[in-house]
Amino acid sequence: MEFDLISLLWGLPAAFALGWLASRFDLRQMRLENRRAPKAYFRGLNHLLNEQHDQAIDAFIEAVQNDPDTSELHFALGNLFRRRGDYDRAVRVHEHLLARADLSAHESARARHALAQDFLKAGLLDRAEAALLRLEGTPLQTDARLARLAIYERTRDWEQAAAMAELLEDAGRGSFQLRLAHYRCEQAATLRQQQHTTEALVLLEQLVQRIPESARAWVQLADLRHSLQQTEGAWAALQGMVQHVPGHLPLVAHNLALWGKRLGRTQAVRALLQQWSEQHAASLDVTQALVSLEDDAQAARALYLEHLRREPSLVAASLWLGGAHWGSPAEQKLVKPALERACEPLKRYRCAGCGFEARQYFWHCPGCQSWDSYPPLRIEEI
């Protein structure tokens, strides 16, 4: 008994010393690892600032290995993989985050939203939508609905897009009325292609009553009525557009003049176009519509001169020269095609968002997928 007591007394200090040494070793190891993690993290940030994405990824991978429980490092690494186009690795990082049992509800929602973004970028729209649907009822619900709206636009699911736009507007994320009008116009265009003209007509007539600020709805309604030999109704639709969305009149100036003449309302159309010209910047489309109403060639050419007094225009100058007799026929044959080629790019429309140029007017930019990003002006007039 005495021997056991003496052994115990000697053993306690030894055990304490060994424990202290072990703790010091673990503490030093922990400090070393914690020192490595911030260094790797800041090194990754430095590479990011220098736009060295590959080196930044390597640094963040090292930081994650040294500190695997830090969710922010995982988010940074996953987002880097996505920006680099390495979607498989981005998905794995965010799925690994979601599998962690210690993740808070907020971080779990963030990880699921990031995962949905990975799927979106990879073109896996079904999986992206499934991930976004699971964010209903979370703080990221509105962001998820915006992403779902983008999916429905890409898949041309206009009914779902319309429903989502109304939910977003109800949530106070701004006005989606014009966007909603575009969705309904797309549906009307589809109905017309399928020969369901009556349904398309009803849809557009209801639309201009609900959202009269939609220039596209008025234009499509006028075009559909005209195709049904309803010239009076088509003319009325164009007048409605001019009343509610006057800035878009240049898009329909030609049809206003053409249909107005057919209905015997040349003077009314001329007065309307002249009044618009006095209140807005010079528009070549409006000038050409006024020219089409003139029977006298000299009076028509005078309209181009009036346009040039208000706004220098190579296109207007070319059209004015086109009606004049100058030089020999051989000289005219040489000069006129050159002028026309020089004017051609100036007649195009240009997206204000991405700069995509097109000969026709687009309501939805084929380049950046923005709605209403084309001003109703030619490039020369911008």
Residue ranges of predicted features:
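Long, contiguous interaction/recruitment modules in multidomain scaffold/adaptor proteins
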Residues: 1-35, 130-133, 137, 142-146, ...
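Alpha-helical segment of the N-proximal tetratricopeptide repeat
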Residues: 33-69, 76, 82-86, 92, ...
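Structural register within alpha-helical repeat arrays
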Residues: 43, 77, 115, 148, ...
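Residue at a conserved register position within TPR or TPR-like alpha-solenoid repeats
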Residues: 47, 81, 119, 152, ...
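Short coil turns that delineate tetratricopeptide repeat
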Residues: 68, 102, 106, 139-140, ...
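TPR alpha-solenoid repeat register
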Residues: 73, 107, 111, 144-145, ...
